[in-house]
Every structure is written in C-alpha cells, then in structure tokens.
C-alpha cells in the first residue's frame, strides 16, 4: 500500500496523475512547494508532507506487525511467540542402526532424522512433519540417488545435511560427516564447512546468480571466501581451470559475461564449477536437470560421473526421474511421505523392486517408443499424503492397489536390499 501511495503522489506531483479540482497528496505538495517564499511565514504549508510520511510509515509498521503475528519465524525482531515455539521440540528416540564407532568412521551417515516445520497462522499452530525417521549412509566416492514425488521429503532431508533449513525447522536425529556431528554445529561452524566440504547445486540455476554480477566476479568472491590472500589474476586463473574442467567452451572470454548470456545447461555447469571451487568432498545435486532438455540432461549426468571418477567426489543426486537416477547412481533410496520406502543398488531397484510405490514409479516412467502407440501413460492415482496430517503405517497405503491390513499399522518397515 505505501508503494501505491508514493507512486500516486509522485505522478500527481509531476502533473501526470490526479489533476485539479480533485485533491491528492501529490497535488497538495505541488501547491505548497510552489509557494516556497511563503514557507518562512507559513510553515504549516508543509503539513501534507508530514502527513504523507506518517501515513506511509503507519502502513509499514502495520504490515510488519501482521507479518510478525502470522509468521513469527520470519520476523526481524524476536517475538514472544517465536521464543515460545522454539522450545516445542519433540523427541523421537527410535532404534539406532549404527554404533557410535561406525558413525564416526563413516563418510556420511544420517541416523533417525526427523524434520518438523512449525507454521503459525494467527493463533493456530500447525506442525508439518516433512521427514519422519530417515536413516542411510554412503561411502566416499559413492553416488547416491534419492527419488520420489514432490513433497516426499527428498530435498528437506539433504538440506538438513547442508544446514540450510529455515528458522522454523526443528531437526532431530544425528548426521555424521567425516566424523563430525553436523546436528551439533552452530551456524558459524556450518558456514566454515559449507562450500569447503559440502557443496550444493539446485534446479533452475539462473535463480542462483546475481544478474548484476559477471561470472568472473562470482568466482572471485567464492574463491576469496576460502583464500582471502588470492590475487585477481590467481582467481581468474583458477576460475578458467574450473570452467574448463566442467566443459564450458571459451572459459577465459566468458568470465566477463553475465548470467543472462548463458543457457540453462551452461549455468548448471558454472554452478558445479563454483561448488568445486573450494574443494568440496560431498556434492548435493538437488534436481540439477530440471527444465533442461534430454540432451543437456545426459551431458550433466556424464559430467557428474566424470567428476566422481577424477576427483573421488561423493554425490547425492535427487530427481523425480528414476531411470535417470539409475543411469548415474550406485545406490538408490525411494522416498514417500517423509519416509524411505525402499533402498538398494540401482540394479536391484530397477530390476527387482519390492515396494508397490517403487513399482508404481517405474510403471509411470515413459518408455522409448510409447508415444507412437495409442496406449495411455500409466500414472499413480490419488494425491501425495499431507505432511501436516500423516497417516499411520505405510504412507502410500491410501493410494496403493495392493494394500493389506498390516500396511496401516504403526510399525512401518522399509525394504532394504543393501
């Protein structure tokens, strides 16, 4: 509202908005300013200016108050409601699959991970259980795929590893990375680890770049974050080496270009190069091939496989496309409703799926040549379960054609083949 008021005032002051005899903020200020000689004798002529300032500030304060009331976690200043909600953390002890020695020796182990979002609207508080007891581990140099529909908890699980969850997310469980317990780190400690040891790339890479910064400046800022003593020439040399490694042509010339001058596939290559700039050991690729055509998808997948072979890089690859994941990954985790439905090697998941949800995902994947037939594409009936009100037992049971009575019991067990 203040923006509309100021726009109308500016236009009317310039004579492009509301004109006499109608009255507006801009026309009043224009009249008063035009009689500047009288301001000394009649200072009250500036009254419309002060009233305009008071009205716009009042609307701003009202908007801030409403935001703090309906969404306390995103308030600028701490509120009593935010402090009260931060104390509401449930415990889920669960069963430990790994000993403490195994946790500390492993490359990455996620043990009994729960992520709950507290969303407050007015006096109503809703708890959304996005992840409900996820457990998995991976070795150095392994590529782990996570597949599932939107809302399955894939991205939230991996965002907890990188420490990028919002303030209204409560994380429980244990995450060990190279002997370091990530769930016990402060935000400052996470910043030291993020980028240097854990890198992330996301879908729609164009949104990850500042449109006003050249790619060369982005690389310089990233490199100096870990090595402040680097000179401009050294940063440029390192950036060219990284861009050549990810297969971007004319790397040195293109450092002067801005994000809008690159295609989606080229920007994703640049994102991967930036993730490697500080020497990360684990790369989290959250749907990096979304919105890219099939040819570019294959190139990105091939690039990730090459980086694993050359650098010994460990990769978590998230996607909806189970066939694409199987072509790249060593092991696959199938998630739905915040739980792991099934996990195994790529060959086991593709050739011998055991859970009905995995079978449904495979059946709904378009096959080569199917567009030449009149047969309709298979789809999974129903909707994804609501994380705000999870069902007991297997979350896929309401949509499953093979549902049994035991599927709706509390003790859900995922299918493990590794």
What are these regions (language model features)?
Residues 5-42, 51:
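Glycine-rich helix-loop "coupling/hinge" segments at transmembrane-helix boundaries
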Residues 45, 103-107, 120, 252, ...:
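Charged, flexible cofactor/metal-binding loops and thiol motifs
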Residues 147-148:
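The feature captures the beta-strand-to-loop junction immediately N-terminal to the Walker
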Residues 163, 288, 292-375:
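P-loop NTP-binding/switch modules centered on Walker-like glycine-rich loops
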Residues 170-181:
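Conserved ABC transporter NBD signature motif
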Residues 277-281:
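A short, proline-enriched helix->beta-strand linker immediately N-terminal to the Walker B motif
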